[in-house]
Structure formats: structure tokens, C-alpha cells
From Swiss-Prot:
This is Pheromone-processing carboxypeptidase KEX1. The gene is KEX1. Belongs to the peptidase S10 family. It is an enzyme of class 3 (hydrolase). PANTHER family: PHEROMONE-PROCESSING CARBOXYPEPTIDASE KEX1 (PTHR11802:SF190), SERINE PROTEASE FAMILY S10 SERINE CARBOXYPEPTIDASE (PTHR11802). Keywords: Apoptosis, Carboxypeptidase, Glycoprotein, Golgi apparatus, Hydrolase, Membrane, Protease, Signal, Transmembrane, Transmembrane helix. It comes from Verticillium alfalfae (strain VaMs.102 / ATCC MYA-4576 / FGSC 10136). The chain crosses the membrane at residues 525-545. The active site is at S176, D376, H438. Residues 25-524 are lumenal. GO terms for cellular component: membrane; trans-Golgi network. One of its GO terms (molecular function) is serine-type carboxypeptidase activity.
Length: 635
């Protein structure tokens, strides 16, 4: 090949690699999920799933599952969802809370409260070793800044694979121990943005944390207060006196050093569940469900058998046809586990300060929404409300709007039912969901979607939709959700009062407007790439023509030589009650998935790294002598 042509070929390859589709799109195709077993009839949801490497030295890969939005209202948005633990899979969120589908038996049904109505959803099993993610078993993470660094690397590679989402408005949402993860990730994103050019910054627009484990000081102090308020314990009783003594021990330890989890304080929750347990007629003990105190469970599980959907979700995610659809490696031996006890045991974060300390600085730049289910004990609303009341940010303390005056609690009604209240001041919003558990979207999917739509300032009138009847202080604003689809086989909202029910307004005209909005959102990037390809082809043809005229003996470009590159929700308590359903089951299989060119988005394969990996391993429910069951890693 003539030097001029060789130089041109090199230049064209570099130019094309710069274009936002080329290599990223061809690699993204490897992640495409064509369909899911048991998927309901109707328009399919566009999905991508698979692993992205975040630690090449220790075979660390994070698993993601991405769902494209149904509608685009005003602008593109992406919600990145994380569950708790540490070590509990975000498939809890995908399959039991905010994702497009719920599992019934071996089939999927539509979730009318799915948050993908107006936002792309990205679920990530975080940190490495959680759920379908994996890493060498001696390389679990220990601190929150380590986790934050790896998550930034994950996002860099994800947006390189899917550049069409890189400029979306980004919202991080999650629950429980994600109350630690999310603020740390946000801090790392803001630090990255300070160093990045204007066109390379990520549009972090908000953080949304439900029943979060954020401030150990207030949360540990709330256990007894919540037990008294709900009538689980009688204040002044002998049992209460025992627990007050344990609270004194806890406070003494916190006076020395406040860590993210403190065993002397974890014991308070364990003892509440122990002393309030009752004997059944069969001689077995029943205890309160720590995630929803309206319910009971067998002791010492105390909520680990909940939610009931888990009995269908676990076998579904272990099916071979499902793991193949999600691009999980065939060498995986034991299948998906909700929580990985080894991850939780390693991730003690003893050198990390509680994320509560990050909130005042974050609130200067990013709106934050905290929400609570009123019936959750383990990360209860009293602790969250007291944390807010004690915290100073943006020039004042708590929800104070002027000296001595606090922002009011504004009544929230949803389709005529009392749903809770909203309270907000200086970039912080608090939402209380009445009659809701630790997993609010599980109980009230459509109410939770109404919340996220308000947070994202969705105006569905932009696509011709009709808002559902959601009112704050009697006012019905435009930033609300659509009613559910008529006749769909949705997992219903089953709370007393009839749940969240409605009818569909998504007619053909609405769909037409939605399609037009999608086209406008993606048109520009496709047009740019098309222009580049046309120019490149024209230049290439001109050089070939000119060289053939100059060298009559030339027989073709490259002569066939192949020119160019060929190549859970966690919960805490009961002495590290952080891991739900914990059962040690360390993976020993290898992982052999396709390399993604120079992105190193890969999984381990045969060779020097053939050793033990952890992929969502976890331990079975065990009665730890003298402690009750251990959830080594989940809030």
C-alpha cells in the first residue's frame, strides 16, 4: 500500500474510533438482551446486561442490567439503582421494586410502578462479589472510597460502550446501606467533574435514598424510640430496662468513635427482636419482621424470609435460559444469591467516615431526597428525621426556613388516599410513606414512581400524557406519573385501602409523540456519524482512484491482506444483620466471556488466574449462638 494511502487509512480509523457509535456500538451489541424467558406479551423493553471489568489484577467485574425508558419527557434521564448490604444484589430492586417486571412463578408480569416510564434504569451489583458481579475471593473491597473509585471506572467504561446515555441527567437511587454507597459515589463524580472538560462532565442531578443507613448515631438511637412508638415494647418495663442498659453501652462506645457499624449498638436491635418474640401453640418462636413490624416471622429469621416474591425471584435468576439471556458465564456453578456474606464481612468500612458527614457539602451542589417507609424498624424513619433535624447545611439547621420556623410537613394524597407527607428546604427533601416497609417500592410501586417523577421534574404534558391524581397540600402539579395500563397483569399495590389503581391513557397519539421525542433525542448523534462515514468513504475512493492512475500495476486496496486492525436491600442489625439469607458458597468456577476490544470489559478465563471467584455467594440462615442469625452485610 502506498504511504499516502497507509497514512490515510490510519487517520480514517482514528477518526472513526472517535465517532460516538463505531466500536462502542459494536461492543454494546454483545450486551443486547433479545428477550427474557416468561416475558409478558406486548411491546418489549429494550435491555442490555453483562459484566464490565473494574479490577484487571484481581478479575473484578461488575454486573449491570440496563432498561431503556418507555417515554422521553423534556430530556433524557437515567436512574442508577443500588441495593444495600454491603453485598446484596441490585436485582432485588430490578425484580421486586422499581424494574419493568415482577416474577410470578416461572413467569414475568408487568410492573405498573416501574420507574422506567420516564427514565432509563441501570441496576449494578455493587461492590464486586455481589449478585452476578465477581472478583477473586481474596480481593473483596474494604472501604467506601475504594468502592467509589471502582464505580467511577465502571461508569467510564459503561458510557464508552453506550455513549448515547453519557449526557443524560443522572440520578442515583437506592435503599438501606446504599445510603453509604450513593453519597460516596456522588462525591467521586463531583471530583471527577472538576478535572474533566465541559463536554466530558456527567450531569449529576440528584440523589434519592430510601430507608437509608446514613448516620449511625441517630439510627442506633432510634431503635428503642421506634419500639416504644409502635408498641413493640412498654416503656419502663423490665424488658425495656434491659434494652436501655444496652443503649448506655452503645452511647459510651459512640462517644469514643462513631463508625458505620458498631457491634455494641447492633446488639440493641438483636435484643429487641429477642425479648419481643412469642411462643406459638406449636412451641416455636415468632418475632417481629424487622423490615415491616406489622408482620411476624419465625425466630431467628425475623424478616429474612421476606419479601414473599423472593421465593420466585431466586429460582428465576438461577435458570440457565435466564442467565444465558443476561450474558452470565456458563461456568458459574451455584447461581444467583441475594446477598454475599463474604462481601459484607470484608466491607467493614472501619476507615471510612459515615456518609452523613458528606451530605452538607453535597447539598451545596446536588439536590437530595430521603424517603422512609413508616413501618420499617431496621433503618426507621425516626432515625432519618432526627439526623435531618441535627444536621446543618446551606446556612441553617434542619428544615429551618427562618429563625424558629421550620418548613411544614405537606400532606400527600394519592388517588384520594393518605400517602404520607413531603417536607423540604435548601436542596433537601424528605418523604414519609405511610403503611410502607423497608422496601417502599415493593409496597407502593406507583406511589414511589410518582415520587421519582416529581424529583426528576417530569412534565408528562410534554408527551400528551394525563397525570394521575397525586396532590401535595391539595395541589395537583404537572410533574406527576401516568396511571397504570388497563388490564395488565401487574403486581398490585396491596396496602389497605385498595392500593394504587387506575386506568391507561397511553393511546396511539401519545405513542406517536413519544416516538417523535425519541427520534429528536438521538437524531443528532446518528447524523454526525453518518456525515463522518460519507466523507471518509469519499476520501478513500478518491485516493484509490488517484493511486491507480499513477501506478497502473496496482491490483487492489490491501491486496486481500487484511489491512487495518484485525483484532438487599439490605438491612442491618442482629450483630452485622447486614446480610440477608447469608450462606457461604464461594464460587470456584472460571469465567469465559467475550473480550470487548481495548476496553478490557472482560471476565476471567483459563490461564494463570484460574482460581476461586465469588459471584453472589452467601450464607444460609444460621442461628449464631448467642447472637441470633447473622446477616453479615446487609442494611
Amino acid at each position: 500500500m502506498a504511504p499516502a494511502i497507509r497514512q490515510l487509512a490510519t487517520g480514517l480509523l482514528l477518526a472513526l474510533s472517535w465517532a460516538p457509535t463505531t466500536r462502542a456500538d459494536s461492543s454494546a451489541a454483545d450486551y443486547y438482551v433479545k428477550s427474557l424467558p416468561g416475558q409478558p406479551a406486548g411491546p418489549p423493553v429494550k435491555m442490555h446486561a453483562g459484566h464490565i471489568e473494574t479490577d484487571a489484577d484481581h478479575n473484578g467485574n461488575l454486573f449491570f442490567w440496563h432498561f431503556e425508558n418507555k417515554h422521553i419527557a423534556q430530556r433524557q434521564r437515567t436512574v442508577i439503582w443500588l441495593n444495600g448490604g454491603p453485598g446484596c444484589s441490585s436485582e432485588d430492586g430490578a425484580m421486586m421494586e422499581i424494574g419493568p417486571y415482577r416474577v410470578k412463578g416461572d413467569q414475568l408480569v408487568n410492573n405498573n410502578g416501574s420507574w422506567h416510564e420516564f427514565a432509563n434504569l441501570l441496576f449494578v451489583d455493587n461492590p464486586v462479589g455481589t449478585g452476578f458481579s465477581y472478583v477473586d475471593t481474596n480481593s473483596y473491597l474494604h472501604e467506601l472510597d475504594e468502592m467509589g473509585d471502582q464505580f467511577i471506572l465502571f461508569l467510564e467504561k459503561f458510557f464508552k460502550l453506550f455513549p448515547q446515555y453519557a449526557q443524560d441527567d443522572l440520578y442515583f437511587a437506592g435503599e438501606s446501606y446504599a445510603g453509604q454507597h450513593i453519597p460516596y459515589i456522588a462525591k467521586h463524580i463531583l471530583e471527577r467533574n472538576e478535572k474533566a472538560g465541559p463536554d466530558d462532565q456527567w450531569n449529576l442531578k440528584g440523589l434519592v435514598i430510601g430507608n437509608g443507613w446514613i448516620s449511625p448515631f441517630e439510627q442506633y438511637g432510634s431503635y428503642l424510640k421506634f419500639a416504644y412508638e409502635k408498641g413493640l415494647l412498654a416503656q419502663g418495663s423490665e424488658k425495656a430496662k434491659q434494652l436501655e442498659q444496652q443503649w448506655k453501652i452503645c452511647r459510651k462506645q459512640m462517644a469514643v468513635d462513631i463508625k458505620i457499624d458498631i457491634s455494641e449498638c447492633e446488639a440493641i436491635l438483636q435484643k429487641i427482636l429477642d425479648v419481643t418474640a412469642t411462643l406459638t401453640t406449636s412451641g416455636k418462636r415468632n418475632c417481629y419482621n424487622m423490615y415491616d413490624v406489622r408482620l411476624k416471622d419465625t425466630y431467628p429469621s425475623c424478616g429474612m424470609n421476606w419479601p414473599p416474591d423472593l421465593t420466585d425471584v431466586t429460582p428465576y435468576l438461577r435458570r440457565k435460559d435466564v442467565t444465558e439471556a443476561l450474558h452470565i458465564n456458563a461456568a458459574k456453578n451455584t447461581g444467583w444469591k441475594e446477598c454475599n456474606g463474604a462481601v459484607g464481612s470484608a466491607f467493614r468500612a472501619h476507615k471510612s467516615k459515615p456518609s452523613r458527614d458528606l451530605l452538607p457539602d453535597l447539598l451545596k451542589k446536588v439536590p437530595i431526597t430521603l424517603f422512609s417507609g413508616a413501618e420499617d424498624l431496621i433503618c426507621n424513619h425516626i432515625g432519618t428525621e432526627e439526623m435531618i433535624g441535627n444536621m446543618e447545611w446551606n446556612g441553617a439547621k434542619g428544615f429551618e426556613v427562618s429563625p424558629g420556623n421550620w418548613a411544614p410537613r405537606r400532606d400527600w394524597t394519592f388517588e384520594g388516599k393518605d400517602a404520607g407527607f413531603w417536607q423540604e428546604a435548601r436542596n433537601l427533601t424528605y418523604v414519609l410513606f405511610k403503611e410502607a416497609s423497608h422496601m417502599v417500592p415493593f409496597d407502593w410501586p406507583r406511589r414511589s414512581r410518582d415520587m421519582i417523577d416529581r424529583v426528576m421534574k417530569v412534565d408528562i404534558s410534554a408527551i400528551g400524557g394525563e397525570p394521575t391524581d397525586s396532590r401535595i397540600d391539595g395541589e395537583k402539579g404537572p410533574v406527576t406519573s401516568v396511571p397504570p395500563s388497563k388490564g395488565s397483569n401487574n403486581h398490585p399495590d396491596t396496602k389497605p385501602g385498595g392500593g394504587d389503581k387506575g386506568s391507561s391513557t397511553n393511546d396511539d397519539e401519545t405513542q406517536k409523540q413519544v416516538d417523535e421525542a425519541k427520534w429528536k433525542a438521538y437524531y443528532r448523534s446518528g447524523e454526525i456519524v453518518l456525515v463522518i462515514v460519507v466523507i471518509a468513504a469519499g476520501l478513500w475512493g478518491w485516493y484509490i482512484w488517484r493511486d491507480r492512475r499513477r501506478r497502473s500495476g496496482y491490483q487492489g486496496v490491501a491486496g486481500g491482506d487484511g489491512a487495518g486492525p484485525g483484532h438487599r436491600a439490605g438491612a442491618r442489625g442482629l450483630d452485622r444483620f447486614q446480610d440477608r439469607r447469608t450462606a457461604r458458597d464461594v464460587e470456584t468456577g472460571d469465567f469465559d466471556e467475550s473480550e470487548l476490544d481495548d476496553l478490557h470489559v472482560e471476565t476471567p478465563r483459563e490461564g494463570p488466574h484460574k482460581e476461586a471467584y465469588a459471584i453472589g455467594d452467601d450464607s444460609d440462615e444460621e442461628d449464631i449462638k448467642g447472637k441470633g442469625p447473622e446477616r453479615s452485610g446487609t442494611r
